[in-house]
Amino acid sequence: MAQTNPNYATPSSVRSVTSYPARRGYKQAVDPALDHVVGVDDAIDIHCHAHEGQQDALGVAKLATKSGMKGILYKTIVGRKNPAGTVAGVRQALESWCAEKNLLPTHLWPGSSVTQGFLSKIEPAWSAKQLKAGVVGLWMPNNTSANTLSLVGGKPSAWDKNADPKAHTEPLPWDEALKYGHYLLDEKGRLQPEIEEIFRMAHDQNAAIFFGHPTKPEFHAMAEYSQKIGFKKGVVDHPFSPFVNLTIEEMKDAASAGLWLNFTFDELSPLLGIDPANMYKAIRSAGPEHCTLSSDAGEPLFPNSVESLRLLRGYMAAFGCTADEIYTMSTVNPAFIVGLELETKQRASAGR
């Protein structure tokens, strides 16, 4: 894939032409006094954050349960060294609470990064340990990727114990980004053997791999290797984000190559500002059967993950996705990624 620099965060004067008909035509009764969120029935969030300084893992699980969600995959959670163990504790607490409230608990799954932080080598043994413990999704490098450091910089305290913990660098030159961050390719532009081994492990254990924040060469190499080994659970997180930065045509190609496109509320948030009309165009181009909708929420500048999902689903419905397509992207496809068997792939209200 050639390097591209698309801009899908259209100016307000442009996006208002498509957004006003959408917002005026979409109706959803929302009572702010409710103790749950409407409009997220059966949804599975495959990208939820609950680590230090973010939303509470048990609290968001309770809200998801009350709101009728089917499940949450925690990308991050307090206790990152043992995410499966931490999620097991949250699950136990949720089940006890649900027994008191006579509610059916939402499913909870652990995810894990393939890294153990900046300056640490990516070791297959780490991922093998997480998969054995019950992790269902592995994330390639995100904030620790060389690509991220070259685009937005990072917190130098992560690689320099004497640095100000509140400091954040400017974007780093590529040679510095490579010094402190992770890069998945060898000197010949091929996936490092350790990365290929992790893909094979995930394939053998029916786990997903989220591609993280790759450069285009890294992305292309992961896509090719997924095809080579017949891997069906390669997920392209937030494809509009500057850390992935695909064009809509590239998203269509990725879907045709067997990858999942995981669109997120983060992309639509004011912090990234993607025009929801363009996200809808991407879904229509790639096909809802290749797409998922998730929150990528948890930080205090966002709504909680349950409300973020309501908003994301609402935006896509307002711009033209049908109820069946929303169900496919929010329930059927995420269920495949986390390995949940559904009783039916048809939404409960279909045919009524």
Where are these regions (language model features)?
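Mid-to-C-terminal alpha-helical segments outside catalytic/metal-binding sites
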Residues: 2-4, 15-17, 306-352
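Active-site mouth loops of central-metabolism enzymes
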Residues: 41-58, 109-120, 185-190, 212
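Divalent metal-dependent hydrolysis catalytic cores, especially in the metallo-beta-lactamase
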Residues: 45, 60-83, 103-116, 135-145, ...
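Active-site metal-binding loops of divalent metal-dependent hydrolases
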Residues: 48-50, 77-78, 113, 142-143, ...
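An N-terminally biased module of ancient metal coordination in phosphate/nucleic-acid-related enzymes
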Residues: 1-107, 125-128
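Histidine/acidic residue-rich metal-binding segments in metalloenzymes
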Residues: 29-39, 58-65, 86-98, 122-134, ...
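Short acidic/histidine-rich active-site segments
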Residues: 264, 288-305
